[in-house]
């Protein structure tokens, strides 16, 4: 499975003997470890650094690197031939050689690059949930149990759909969707609008329980402005979002809880 993942990703990236991988993500996560396995299996040059440092990354002379979105904003992307992005959803206006990936630990790293499955990877949507099948899937967990169906498919727990051109659009984790007044709101959609506000440095959106609406859209915001108001952020989003998706609660916080790969820990967004 590890070899299949390394070969499929290397083929999509058109890796050659002249390439040089840089590993700067935590090696305890599949996003970091997979850089090591790709280099070992393809024989490319490898540099490993202890954590992300913008200056060290920029001076590495590597051609390939795997990053999270927040790290991308701190370097000059043109220094690399290709940048593989994981973790939080990357910006839509990223440079063309910055590749948005989709995958899980169970898939051995990304199996969908810029919406297109890697060779030997199959994608199906069953009841709105993304299912993946391919030779890079895990055999089982350490306790011997397997998440795979009898015919080899992995239910990912992510909801999404296939576009007309066959590319995959992932909406988010099944448990992340906010049900407010009978309408469904995806946190990512609201976050993409809020982060464009000039006084918002970081943001995460979640659903909080509400007696009237079932759930309300709540925005947790990092801002240097202590007087940033709910009315202001609602007005900022109003032209791009339907009324039911506008935040009904604003919480100003010092930091957004995130994983080492930049994903929001939504379970920790509480008041």
Question: Which residues are covered by each model-predicted region?
Answer:
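Short beta-strand-to-turn element immediately C-terminal to the catalytic PLP-Schiff-base lysine
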Residues: 111-115, 126, 133, 163, ...
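Hydrophobic/anchoring residues in structured secondary elements
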Residues: 85, 205, 251-252
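Conserved ATP/PPi-binding loop(s) of AMP-dependent carboxylate-activating enzymes
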Residues: 117, 126-151, 167, 173, ...
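AMP-binding/adenylate-forming catalytic core of the ANL superfamily
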Residues: 134, 159-245, 255, 262-264, ...
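Short, well-ordered beta-strand segments
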Residues: 20-22, 131, 220
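AMP-binding/adenylate-forming
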Residues: 1-74, 99
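General small-molecule cofactor/ligand-binding pocket signal
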Residues: 47-49, 99, 124, 250-253
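Gly/Ser/Thr-rich phosphate-binding loop
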Residues: 63-67, 71-117, 122-124
